Amino acid sequence: FDVPEPFKWVDHFFYEKLDEQHKGLFFAFFDWGKGPDYWGKDTISLSQEQVDAKFELDLEYGIFYGNGETIENPSENGDLQGIFFSWGSE
């Protein structure tokens, strides 16, 4: 399906001084914006790696669950995406 115009990713929206963690994420978005013919395994894998890295970083620094509780033992929490996708569902 087509992505509505206000939500299309455009190449000119890029920060030159972007840290390495986020550069891969930006490039994955650029590939996603090109359409399904460009959604190779590498793009999907990179996107997943970037999301997982973000969750790990947030947990490492004790980011909130979303309900005001901090994460007690970030290294022991294996359901990183479960935390993210549960925000606002309580």
Swiss-Prot record:
Identify the keywords attached in UniProt to this record, alphabetized: Protease inhibitor, Secreted
- GO annotation (BP), single: suppression of blood coagulation in another organism
Tell me where on the tree of life, at the top rank, the source sits. Answer: Eukaryota
Q: Specify where it is mainly localized.
A: secreted
The entry lists its GO molecular-function terms as:
peptidase inhibitor activity
Instruction: Kindly indicate whether the keyword NAD belongs to this entry.
Output: no
One GO cellular component term of this record is: extracellular region
Q: Which compartment or compartments is the protein found in?
A: Secreted
The role this protein plays is:
Potent anticoagulant inhibiting the amidolytic activity of factor Xa (F10) (Ki=4nM) and reducing its ability to activate prothrombin (F2) in the prothrombinase complex (EC(50)=40nM).
Under what name is this protein listed?
Leech factor Xa inhibitor
Q: Which organism is it from?
A: Haementeria depressa (Leech)
